[in-house]
């Protein structure tokens, strides 16, 4: 959190086109408790401009070779199914595909874990909710992949309900 109340939601939709142009950077995602009032009632307005699921997606959209879990352990214990993503996500990538992007508004990135047939897709947006279009044409043909989708819940809102999320599983192919 910054002393002035945190970054605006579009901040992380700008960084991939500025600081990340030269390669990986130091960034600290993984904040599940975004409201400062949770820790200090004298700061009722301070909060990070993000949702819990956006924090997960940042592990993919903001590559950093030294990732960490940036929140308090108690907050991860409150959301163990979401924390599982942080435990599982790769930190080193062999391939990256930018599937859709508009600087400052949204970005969707697919990355292949180095030395593995594991793929991760991260999609983030600014303060305006949107549905990402994810073509799986980057996947090798003739294979099926089990997908775990971490998505903002229907009632998620970065200001009012940042911890609403859904997790679902399915099968995808390159088609």
Please give the residue ranges for each predicted region.
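Glycan-recognition surfaces
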Residues: 1-73, 100-101
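Structured core elements
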Residues: 26, 57-62, 109, 120-123, ...
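Acidic/polar loop patches that form or flank catalytic/metal-binding clefts of enzymes
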Residues: 65-79, 95-97, 133
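Generic secondary-structure signature for well-ordered alpha-helical cores
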Residues: 66-67, 91, 126, 175
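Edge strands and adjacent loops of beta-rich recognition modules
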Residues: 82-111
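Beta-strand-rich interaction surfaces with strong enrichment in secreted/lumenal proteins
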Residues: 95-99, 108-110, 119, 168-170, ...
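Carbohydrate-binding surface patches
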Residues: 103-143
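C-terminal beta-sandwich/jelly-roll accessory domains of carbohydrate-active enzymes
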Residues: 126-175
């Amino acid at each position: 959190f910054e002393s002035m109340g945190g970054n605006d939601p579009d901040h992380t939709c700008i960084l991939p086109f500025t600081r990340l142009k030269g390669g990986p950077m130091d960034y600290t995602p993984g904040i599940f408790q975004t409201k400062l009032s949770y820790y200090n009632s004298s700061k009722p307005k301070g909060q990070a401009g993000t949702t819990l699921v956006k924090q997960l997606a940042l592990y993919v959209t903001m590559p950093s070779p030294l990732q960490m879990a940036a929140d308090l352990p108690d907050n991860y214990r409150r959301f163990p199914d979401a924390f599982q993503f942080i435990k599982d996500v790769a930190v080193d990538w062999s391939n990256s595909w930018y599937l859709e992007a508009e600087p400052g508004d949204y970005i969707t990135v697919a990355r292949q874990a180095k030395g593995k047939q594991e793929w991760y897709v991260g999609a983030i947006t600014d303060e305006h909710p949107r549905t990402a279009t994810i073509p799986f044409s980057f996947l090798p043909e003739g294979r099926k992949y089990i997908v775990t989708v971490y998505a903002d819940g229907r009632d998620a809102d970065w200001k009012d309900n940042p911890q609403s999320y859904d997790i679902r599983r399915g099968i995808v192919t390159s088609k």
